A protein has these predicted regions:
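Short, surface-exposed beta-strand/strand-loop-strand elements in extracellular ectodomains
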Residues: 46-69
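C-terminal interaction-tip segments
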Residues: 1-34, 96-119
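Short proline/glycine- and polar residue-rich coil/turn motifs
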Residues: 70-77
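Exposed aromatic-hydrophobic patches
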Residues: 77-83
Length: 119
């Protein structure tokens, strides 16, 4: 259960993505539950490139696609900020940009102390 007597903490993480490979962009730490509030993927390539975004649920060992093969236009971005995704300890987000692309990702989360959650 989340401990509401302790303040939550905010964190942003940025990563230069490796093209053609799954890149872990954020992992929820032990003893925390994280609310993903913002996710940016920026295409810095002169051509349109695809991106795949996955959520890995460690409690079930399953992977769920959030975005599968979405085309990000040249010098454009994909932004998620109209809803939340809740990650438990050990859950992580990965982004796989198309081979030959140059992309960056930024994730902003609010982390809540939750001593009951561990990997």
């Amino acid at each position: 259960m989340i401990d509401n007597t302790r303040a939550s903490r905010f964190r942003s993480v940025g990563l230069n993505l490796t093209a053609g490979s799954a890149n872990t962009v954020y992992t929820c730490p032990n003893n925390f539950t994280s609310k993903v509030e913002l996710l940016f993927v920026c295409n810095k390539t002169s051509g349109n490139k695809t991106v795949q975004i996955d959520w890995h649920d460690t409690s079930t060992g399953l992977t769920y696609s959030i975005v599968g093969g979405y085309t990000v236009s040249a010098y454009n971005f994909l932004k998620f900020d109209q809803a939340y995704l809740v990650l438990n300890a050990g859950d992580y987000l990965s982004i796989t940009p198309e081979a030959g692309s140059t992309m960056d990702a930024t994730v902003s989360v609010e982390q809540y102390f939750d001593p009951a959650t561990r990997v």
